[in-house]
Amino acid sequence: IGSFGFVTFYHKDYKEADDTAYKILQITDVHILNDEKKDAKVYKTVKNMVETTKPDMIILTGDLTSEKENFTAFKSFCSFLEDFNIPWGFTFGNHEGLDIAYEKNEVLDPEKIADRQTLSDYLESLSNCIYEAGDENVDGTGNYYYNVTDDNGKVLTTLIMMDTHSWDKENNGYDHFHDNQIEWYENTIKSIAKEVNGDESKVVPSLAFFHVPMKEYMTAYEEAKGTDNRLWGYRFPNEDGTPAVDDMMFEKMVELGSTKGCFAGHDHMNNFSVMKDGIRLTYGLSDDHNIYLTPLRGGILINIKNDGSFTTQHLIRHRGQNTITIGKEQ
């Protein structure tokens, strides 16, 4: 597979995967910038994916917009998602803040510009958005969870949404999960196990969604080359936006045994998916038309099964094409 991963895609009419109880569409890095022509391409791609696959939920893993006039763009895309009238979740990326784009003493228009807290409050006001700001004593904005249940109310899987912050000035690189977030994650997993199964050691399957990928994404990619551990998708050479430090979050996931899949964004040119230590590490596909000339845009369809397991399918919109290519179930 050389410097790249691989995946077999094929054109076909969409058919729901067998034994699917719940479908989630992951989208990421849409970077709405109030550019009517470019933004329209994002809206069209997302609308096409939703109408084709009819997901039960949409999760956007960060970088909905960038810093300049972010509130205008943010509200526009949120309104668009609300109109699908299905639940949708959100995790903050590294571009929703204001510290990069504006001078310290610059006068900002509150109707057009917003800090993270204002964006968080806005998300919580929306009727279809499941976002929660989370515990104020835990670092980050938007550490929360959502239980997916079957028709009888049985919890099939827990969706863990977490904030990976923005820039780590101390280590001069992208930020990571902080210690009290990892503690929150552990407490959440054990609390759900106790509530659902009466024993905190009997964990419920979970999937984690966040923006900046853990360092293990790159480790897993390198370890998989030349082995039977099949790589799905694509890695752009030297595209590595993982954190500056190892935060030990992955080790905690392995220790607890609940989280079976992680879904990140951030690295616009990467969309690979690979197994490591029993956890599927998956990049979403960037839908950005403003920052990078990404050749493949689209999303990841997550098919949660009746036993709590899951599969994924890449949904691809090739540059210059209006149709969606449906990937094989993985």
Give, region by region, the residue ranges found by the protein language model.
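His/acidic metal-ligating clusters that form di-metal
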Residues: T53-D56, T158-M161, N172-D267
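Acidic/histidine-rich helix-loop elements
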Residues: L25-Y43, T65-T72, L98-E111, K169-H176, ...
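N-terminal active-site segment of His-dependent metallophosphoesterases
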Residues: G2-S76
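Active-site-proximal beta-strand elements of phosphoester/diester hydrolases
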Residues: A21-N34, L156-H165, F209, R280-S286
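Active-site environment of divalent metal-dependent phosphoester hydrolases
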Residues: L33-E36, S66-E69, F90-Y102, W167-E170, ...
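Extended active-site neighborhood of metal-dependent phosphoesterases/phosphodiesterases
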Residues: T8, K12-D13, K75-V196, E200-S201, ...
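Binuclear metal-dependent phosphoesterase catalytic core
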Residues: Y145-G153, M249-L256, N270-Q330
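Active-site neighborhood of phospho(di)ester-bond hydrolases with catalytic His/Asp-centered motifs
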Residues: Q26-T28, I58-D63, W88-N94, A208-F210, ...
